[in-house]
A protein has these predicted regions:
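Hydrophobic anchor at the beta1->P-loop junction of P-loop NTPases
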Residues: 5
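P-loop (Walker A) phosphate-binding loop of NTP-binding proteins
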Residues: 8
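Conserved lysine of the Walker
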Residues: 13
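Post-Walker A alpha-helix
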Residues: 16-17
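Conserved substrate/cofactor phosphate-moiety recognition/catalytic segment
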Residues: 22-60
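A glycine- and Lys/Arg-enriched "phosphate-lid" helix/loop adjacent to the NTP-binding pocket
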Residues: 87-161
Length: 204
């Protein structure tokens, strides 16, 4: 079984992935931002590095999906392959930070790859308002994230809402992060687990 956590920057994907992996005994697959060779450059010069970054993400997530599908284990993944193509790349293109030529090239790669993989059995979307995202980004203190603009987060949030409302290739669940502190409150985490149990039981 393949479970995936989706959500904006700072929504708590990595934290929830770890907590759920521990609770259920699932194999976690994390987005390793610290080892990304483009991320720091991207946040300092988005226009120069946007295409490189998106292709890097596409490559690593495609490899990850193939690996987890072949493992035979129940896996929980931090961020989906679809978020890059449906949210981040179109947003960069609309902002003038990715050329039309690069955007078309990127999307042709995504269209090809998406035909070769199965979607997750369940996608959990962590919905959070911009103030919550900013608070959590500041809390974790990654230096390269200090330059993220508020309007950038807001635009991503709008795209997340639009994407998840039309997502129809698998089961889905929404967790409202503004009202659920699953990291520090065991009762809130139990609410998440109960909701997931209801979804998982419906898969069999």
């Amino acid at each position: 079984m393949h479970i995936a956590i989706a959500g904006n920057i700072g929504s708590g994907k990595t934290t929830l992935t770890g907590l759920l992996a521990k609770h259920y005994g699932w194999s976690p697959h994390f987005e390793n931002a610290d080892n990304n060779p483009y991320l720091n450059d991207f946040y300092h010069d988005m226009q120069r590095w946007s295409f490189n970054l998106q292709v890097y993400f596409l490559n690593t997530r495609f490899s990850q999906v193939l690996e987890l599908r072949n493992s035979g284990n129940t896996v929980i993944q931090d961020r989906t392959l679809y978020e890059d193509a449906e949210i981040f790349a179109p947003n960069l293109h609309e902002m003038g930070l990715m050329s039309t030529r690069d955007f078309k090239n990127y999307h042709s790669l995504f269209d090809l790859i998406s035909k070769l993989i199965q979607p997750p059995d369940l996608v959990i979307y962590l919905r959070a308002t911009t103030p919550t995202l900013v608070h959590q980004i500041q809390k974790r203190g990654r230096e390269y994230e200090n330059t993220i603009r508020i309007d950038y987060l807001e635009q991503l949030n709008q795209r997340y809402e639009a994407w998840f409302s039309r997502y129809s290739i698998g089961n889905k669940l929404i967790i409202n992060v503004d009202n659920n502190n699953f990291e520090d409150n065991p009762d809130d985490l139990n609410k998440v687990i109960t909701a997931i149990d209801g979804q998982i039981n419906g898969l069999f």
